[in-house]
């Protein structure tokens, strides 16, 4: 996971967002909320996501909203797009999902 130092921070999550890593990711993700009015989460390097990872993203959204901050999901990987489509969650997060063809 990598956080940039831009005006609006971008938090890049790499690797798996599964039950095996959500404990590790939760603290970093929740700590990043509130460092700026908007937090962007870059999901381009997420290789696998399960319901625990989805729940973490939902929690982050709820925490950001409760504190009056914006949370944006960006650059959804194929694994994230597949999970969002399966669970019909694209509308829940409200972020545009751009599907990039595999090279």
Residue ranges and their predicted role:
Residues 1-49, 59-103:
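STAS-like cytosolic regulatory interaction modules
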């Amino acid at each position: 996971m990598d956080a940039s130092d831009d005006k609006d921070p971008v938090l890049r999550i790499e690797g798996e967002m599964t039950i095996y890593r959500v404990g590790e990711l939760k603290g970093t993700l929740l700590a990043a909320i509130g460092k700026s009015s908007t937090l962007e989460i870059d999901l381009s390097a997420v290789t696998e996501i399960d319901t625990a990872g989805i729940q973490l993203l939902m929690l982050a959204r709820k925490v950001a909203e409760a504190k009056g901050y914006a949370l944006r999901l960006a650059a959804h990987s194929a694994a994230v797009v597949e999970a969002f489509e399966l669970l019909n969650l694209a509308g829940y997060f409200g972020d545009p999902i751009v599907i990039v063809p595999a090279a």
